[in-house]
Regions:
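Short, surface-exposed "cap/lid" segments of acyl-processing enzymes
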Residues: 10-76
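Alpha/beta-hydrolase active-site loop
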Residues: 77-111
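Short, surface-exposed alpha-helical segments at coil->helix boundaries
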Residues: 101, 208-212, 240
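C-terminal catalytic histidine-bearing segment of alpha/beta-hydrolase fold enzymes
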Residues: 219-256
Length: 256
Protein backbone atom coordinates (compact mmCIF):
# COMPACT_ATOMS: atom_id res chain seq x y z
CA UNK A 1 0.00 0.00 0.00
CA UNK A 2 1.27 3.49 -0.85
CA UNK A 3 2.14 6.06 1.74
CA UNK A 4 -0.88 7.41 3.60
CA UNK A 5 -1.66 11.11 3.46
CA UNK A 6 -3.43 12.47 6.54
CA UNK A 7 -5.36 15.70 6.70
CA UNK A 8 -8.77 17.32 6.73
CA UNK A 9 -10.97 18.31 3.80
CA UNK A 10 -13.66 20.92 4.51
CA UNK A 11 -13.10 20.08 8.18
CA UNK A 12 -13.50 16.32 7.71
CA UNK A 13 -10.52 14.23 8.88
CA UNK A 14 -9.27 11.68 6.37
CA UNK A 15 -6.41 9.48 5.29
CA UNK A 16 -5.78 8.99 1.57
CA UNK A 17 -3.69 6.45 -0.32
CA UNK A 18 -2.45 7.18 -3.86
CA UNK A 19 -3.22 5.03 -6.91
CA UNK A 20 -0.93 2.35 -8.33
CA UNK A 21 0.35 4.85 -10.94
CA UNK A 22 0.45 8.28 -9.28
CA UNK A 23 1.26 9.95 -12.60
CA UNK A 24 -1.85 8.74 -14.44
CA UNK A 25 -5.48 9.83 -14.15
CA UNK A 26 -7.19 8.09 -11.27
CA UNK A 27 -10.62 7.26 -9.97
CA UNK A 28 -11.58 8.38 -6.46
CA UNK A 29 -13.00 5.91 -3.95
CA UNK A 30 -14.18 7.44 -0.67
CA UNK A 31 -15.72 5.81 2.36
CA UNK A 32 -16.39 5.59 6.07
CA UNK A 33 -15.29 3.18 8.79
CA UNK A 34 -17.27 1.22 11.35
CA UNK A 35 -17.96 2.14 14.96
CA UNK A 36 -16.80 -1.41 15.69
CA UNK A 37 -13.42 -2.58 14.41
CA UNK A 38 -12.02 -1.16 12.17
CA UNK A 39 -13.17 1.90 14.10
CA UNK A 40 -11.11 4.69 12.56
CA UNK A 41 -9.97 6.03 9.23
CA UNK A 42 -6.44 4.61 9.49
CA UNK A 43 -7.70 1.23 10.71
CA UNK A 44 -10.17 1.10 7.82
CA UNK A 45 -7.38 1.91 5.38
CA UNK A 46 -5.31 -0.94 6.81
CA UNK A 47 -8.23 -3.38 6.80
CA UNK A 48 -9.51 -2.57 3.30
CA UNK A 49 -6.55 -1.08 1.37
CA UNK A 50 -7.81 -1.95 -2.15
CA UNK A 51 -4.14 -1.76 -3.08
CA UNK A 52 -4.38 -2.73 -6.74
CA UNK A 53 -6.76 0.01 -7.83
CA UNK A 54 -5.85 2.88 -10.12
CA UNK A 55 -7.70 5.08 -7.69
CA UNK A 56 -7.16 7.39 -4.79
CA UNK A 57 -8.66 5.65 -1.75
CA UNK A 58 -9.95 8.12 0.82
CA UNK A 59 -11.05 7.03 4.29
CA UNK A 60 -13.07 9.63 6.19
CA UNK A 61 -13.37 9.82 9.95
CA UNK A 62 -16.93 9.62 11.24
CA UNK A 63 -18.38 12.26 13.56
CA UNK A 64 -18.19 11.18 17.23
CA UNK A 65 -15.04 9.19 16.41
CA UNK A 66 -11.27 9.74 16.42
CA UNK A 67 -10.36 13.40 16.23
CA UNK A 68 -14.03 14.32 16.60
CA UNK A 69 -14.75 12.46 19.81
CA UNK A 70 -16.71 14.62 22.26
CA UNK A 71 -15.33 15.61 25.64
CA UNK A 72 -15.35 12.42 27.67
CA UNK A 73 -14.30 10.29 24.70
CA UNK A 74 -15.86 6.94 23.96
CA UNK A 75 -17.44 6.82 27.42
CA UNK A 76 -19.47 9.88 26.45
CA UNK A 77 -20.44 8.32 23.11
CA UNK A 78 -21.57 5.17 24.93
CA UNK A 79 -23.52 7.29 27.42
CA UNK A 80 -25.32 9.05 24.59
CA UNK A 81 -26.03 5.75 22.88
CA UNK A 82 -27.42 4.20 26.05
CA UNK A 83 -29.69 7.24 26.44
CA UNK A 84 -30.98 7.08 22.83
CA UNK A 85 -28.92 5.30 20.19
CA UNK A 86 -31.12 6.42 17.31
CA UNK A 87 -31.43 10.13 18.10
CA UNK A 88 -28.08 10.66 19.84
CA UNK A 89 -25.76 8.56 17.66
CA UNK A 90 -27.08 7.06 14.43
CA UNK A 91 -29.03 10.09 13.23
CA UNK A 92 -26.47 12.83 14.01
CA UNK A 93 -23.51 10.79 12.75
CA UNK A 94 -25.25 9.86 9.50
CA UNK A 95 -26.71 13.30 8.82
CA UNK A 96 -23.45 15.12 9.54
CA UNK A 97 -21.26 12.71 7.56
CA UNK A 98 -23.58 12.69 4.55
CA UNK A 99 -24.07 16.43 4.70
CA UNK A 100 -20.37 17.28 4.81
CA UNK A 101 -19.42 14.90 2.00
CA UNK A 102 -19.99 17.16 -1.05
CA UNK A 103 -17.70 19.93 0.21
CA UNK A 104 -15.04 17.45 1.32
CA UNK A 105 -15.23 15.72 -2.06
CA UNK A 106 -14.84 18.98 -3.96
CA UNK A 107 -11.75 19.88 -1.93
CA UNK A 108 -10.19 16.45 -2.43
CA UNK A 109 -10.73 16.63 -6.19
CA UNK A 110 -8.60 19.78 -6.14
CA UNK A 111 -5.96 18.53 -3.70
CA UNK A 112 -5.26 14.96 -4.80
CA UNK A 113 -3.16 14.82 -7.99
CA UNK A 114 -4.96 13.15 -10.88
CA UNK A 115 -8.15 12.43 -8.91
CA UNK A 116 -10.37 13.38 -11.83
CA UNK A 117 -11.87 9.98 -12.63
CA UNK A 118 -15.16 8.36 -11.63
CA UNK A 119 -16.31 8.26 -8.02
CA UNK A 120 -16.99 5.22 -5.87
CA UNK A 121 -18.22 5.23 -2.28
CA UNK A 122 -17.97 2.52 0.37
CA UNK A 123 -18.48 1.91 4.06
CA UNK A 124 -18.84 -0.61 6.83
CA UNK A 125 -21.67 -0.89 9.37
CA UNK A 126 -22.45 2.67 10.53
CA UNK A 127 -20.15 3.87 7.74
CA UNK A 128 -22.21 1.81 5.30
CA UNK A 129 -25.28 3.67 6.52
CA UNK A 130 -23.52 6.91 5.57
CA UNK A 131 -22.54 5.52 2.15
CA UNK A 132 -26.11 4.43 1.45
CA UNK A 133 -27.45 7.83 2.50
CA UNK A 134 -24.91 9.63 0.30
CA UNK A 135 -25.90 7.38 -2.59
CA UNK A 136 -29.62 7.98 -1.99
CA UNK A 137 -29.24 11.75 -1.76
CA UNK A 138 -27.60 12.02 -5.16
CA UNK A 139 -25.55 15.10 -4.28
CA UNK A 140 -22.56 13.64 -6.15
CA UNK A 141 -22.32 11.60 -9.34
CA UNK A 142 -21.44 8.14 -8.05
CA UNK A 143 -20.41 5.40 -10.47
CA UNK A 144 -20.40 2.48 -8.01
CA UNK A 145 -20.80 1.75 -4.31
CA UNK A 146 -19.87 -1.09 -1.96
CA UNK A 147 -20.89 -1.70 1.65
CA UNK A 148 -19.81 -4.33 4.18
CA UNK A 149 -21.64 -5.45 7.32
CA UNK A 150 -24.18 -2.90 6.17
CA UNK A 151 -26.89 -1.19 8.19
CA UNK A 152 -29.51 -1.54 5.46
CA UNK A 153 -32.39 -1.12 7.91
CA UNK A 154 -31.81 0.65 11.22
CA UNK A 155 -34.68 -0.81 13.25
CA UNK A 156 -33.41 -4.43 13.19
CA UNK A 157 -29.94 -3.22 14.24
CA UNK A 158 -31.45 -1.49 17.27
CA UNK A 159 -33.19 -4.76 18.12
CA UNK A 160 -29.88 -6.59 17.77
CA UNK A 161 -28.24 -4.13 20.16
CA UNK A 162 -31.06 -4.77 22.63
CA UNK A 163 -30.16 -8.46 22.55
CA UNK A 164 -26.44 -7.76 22.66
CA UNK A 165 -26.50 -5.39 25.63
CA UNK A 166 -29.59 -6.68 27.46
CA UNK A 167 -31.43 -3.37 27.22
CA UNK A 168 -34.78 -2.18 25.90
CA UNK A 169 -34.93 0.74 23.50
CA UNK A 170 -37.92 3.03 24.01
CA UNK A 171 -39.18 3.97 20.57
CA UNK A 172 -40.80 7.36 20.08
CA UNK A 173 -42.61 8.89 17.14
CA UNK A 174 -39.44 10.82 16.31
CA UNK A 175 -37.09 7.83 16.47
CA UNK A 176 -39.50 5.71 14.41
CA UNK A 177 -39.44 8.39 11.74
CA UNK A 178 -35.63 8.28 11.72
CA UNK A 179 -35.66 4.48 11.43
CA UNK A 180 -38.15 4.71 8.57
CA UNK A 181 -35.81 7.10 6.78
CA UNK A 182 -32.86 4.74 7.27
CA UNK A 183 -34.63 1.82 5.61
CA UNK A 184 -32.91 1.33 2.29
CA UNK A 185 -34.98 -1.69 1.33
CA UNK A 186 -37.92 0.68 1.30
CA UNK A 187 -35.82 3.37 -0.42
CA UNK A 188 -34.17 1.00 -2.91
CA UNK A 189 -35.38 3.04 -5.88
CA UNK A 190 -33.15 5.90 -4.68
CA UNK A 191 -30.01 3.73 -4.90
CA UNK A 192 -29.36 4.23 -8.58
CA UNK A 193 -25.64 3.35 -8.85
CA UNK A 194 -24.44 -0.27 -8.99
CA UNK A 195 -24.16 -1.49 -5.39
CA UNK A 196 -22.17 -4.38 -3.92
CA UNK A 197 -23.28 -5.84 -0.58
CA UNK A 198 -20.82 -7.79 1.58
CA UNK A 199 -21.95 -9.61 4.72
CA UNK A 200 -20.30 -11.91 7.20
CA UNK A 201 -21.72 -15.43 7.28
CA UNK A 202 -21.68 -15.24 11.08
CA UNK A 203 -23.16 -11.74 11.41
CA UNK A 204 -26.48 -11.13 13.15
CA UNK A 205 -29.69 -11.67 11.19
CA UNK A 206 -30.33 -7.94 11.73
CA UNK A 207 -27.61 -7.33 9.13
CA UNK A 208 -27.81 -10.43 6.93
CA UNK A 209 -31.56 -10.52 6.29
CA UNK A 210 -31.99 -6.85 5.27
CA UNK A 211 -28.89 -7.18 3.05
CA UNK A 212 -30.48 -10.15 1.31
CA UNK A 213 -33.77 -8.26 0.98
CA UNK A 214 -31.99 -5.32 -0.64
CA UNK A 215 -30.07 -7.66 -2.94
CA UNK A 216 -33.33 -9.22 -4.07
CA UNK A 217 -34.99 -5.86 -4.61
CA UNK A 218 -32.10 -4.35 -6.58
CA UNK A 219 -30.97 -7.52 -8.32
CA UNK A 220 -27.44 -6.67 -7.24
CA UNK A 221 -24.52 -8.73 -5.92
CA UNK A 222 -24.20 -10.00 -2.35
CA UNK A 223 -20.90 -11.55 -1.27
CA UNK A 224 -20.91 -13.63 1.91
CA UNK A 225 -17.58 -13.86 3.75
CA UNK A 226 -17.25 -17.20 5.54
CA UNK A 227 -16.08 -17.03 9.14
CA UNK A 228 -16.75 -13.30 9.47
CA UNK A 229 -19.17 -11.85 11.98
CA UNK A 230 -19.77 -8.08 12.02
CA UNK A 231 -16.28 -6.69 12.58
CA UNK A 232 -13.33 -7.08 10.22
CA UNK A 233 -10.20 -5.73 11.98
CA UNK A 234 -7.00 -5.24 9.96
CA UNK A 235 -5.10 -8.43 9.28
CA UNK A 236 -8.04 -10.80 9.78
CA UNK A 237 -9.48 -13.20 7.20
CA UNK A 238 -12.70 -11.18 7.32
CA UNK A 239 -10.87 -8.01 6.35
CA UNK A 240 -9.14 -9.86 3.53
CA UNK A 241 -12.51 -11.07 2.27
CA UNK A 242 -13.99 -7.57 2.31
CA UNK A 243 -10.89 -6.13 0.65
CA UNK A 244 -10.98 -8.71 -2.14
CA UNK A 245 -14.68 -8.13 -2.78
CA UNK A 246 -14.35 -4.33 -2.78
CA UNK A 247 -11.20 -4.40 -4.94
CA UNK A 248 -12.70 -6.66 -7.59
CA UNK A 249 -15.95 -4.69 -7.65
CA UNK A 250 -14.37 -1.27 -8.05
CA UNK A 251 -11.79 -2.57 -10.55
CA UNK A 252 -14.68 -3.69 -12.77
CA UNK A 253 -16.80 -0.60 -12.28
CA UNK A 254 -14.35 2.31 -12.18
CA UNK A 255 -12.20 3.36 -15.10
CA UNK A 256 -10.15 6.54 -14.76
Amino acid sequence: MGEMIEGAAAGVPFVAVPPVDPGAPAALVAGWHLMDAPAGERAMAEAVPMAGLQAWRVYFGLPLSGARLPEGGYDEVFRRASEDAVLNVFQPVTEQAAGEFPAALAELRDRLPGATGPLGVFGGSAGALVALEVLARGDAEITAAAVASPVVQLAPVIAANERRFGVTYSWTERSRAVAARYDYVDRAAELTAPLLLVAGADDDIAVREPAEALRAKLGTELVTVDGMAHEFPPGTPGAAGVDTAFSEWFARRLRA
